[in-house]
Amino acid sequence: MAWSASQYVKFEDERTRPARDLLAQVPLQKIRRAVDLGCGPGNSTELIIERYGADGVSGLDSDMNMLEAARKRLPGTAFVEADLGSWQPMEPADLLFANAVFQWLPDHLDIFDRLMDGLSPGGVLAVQMPDNLGEPSHLAMEEAAHAGPWKTAFEAKSVRRKGLPAPSAYYSRLITKASRVDVWHTIYNHPMADAAAIVEWVKGTGLMPYLAHAGERYREAFLADYLQRVEKAYPKLSDGRVLLRFPRIFMVAVKG
């Protein structure tokens, strides 16, 4: 699945706010080495640099389009192509920071085990993930997938993202290698211009696998069907806008 940095940054302020909120809970005063895991176009990497300085900060991503955008944004920072499913720090890191990436990796609890091993004593694993599969925006994706002439493709193979484990599962796994684990949810309510703006938002993330699976032949028809469902699910407010409810889960683990 190819990502588009230009599509992703259309709502950069809204996407960056959770990264800012996550970083605010990292209890490190200074770092020698920090890695932004799934750095995307570098918006979260930039936050880390603003707080700690550029020395020792790097980013990694599996998508070349995102990496090119990150390198253009922060030309003095090292950005590396890597697969988070198998990546391991070559030397201990003080901060491993992951903003909205691990929801795409179903086995991320096992990956967290490995990442905790890659931290220096007192180092921090900080993670944020969307927890929104039960929201109308994502339920409508599944409804649309099984409603049109493209449905046979989705019946043969589901592209629905796997749901996240319970907060207790994260705590129980992380605390085995941590002296402190904080897990919390935040629900953001984003005012959007209209339902079409919600569609434009998810085109950069959650809707991507659905559009890819529908194929070029049905892409526009799928989008039209999905938009109609989103319009019904998100009624207009008094000023004509709609409100996108967006739950996210956060966790900060300090290695013992």
Curated annotation (Swiss-Prot):
One of its GO terms (molecular function) is trans-aconitate 2-methyltransferase activity. Its EC number is 2.1.1.144. It is an enzyme of class 2 (transferase). It comes from the Bacteria. Belongs to the methyltransferase superfamily. Tam family. Catalyzes the S-adenosylmethionine monomethyl esterification of trans-aconitate. This is Trans-aconitate 2-methyltransferase. It comes from Rhizobium leguminosarum bv. trifolii (strain WSM2304).
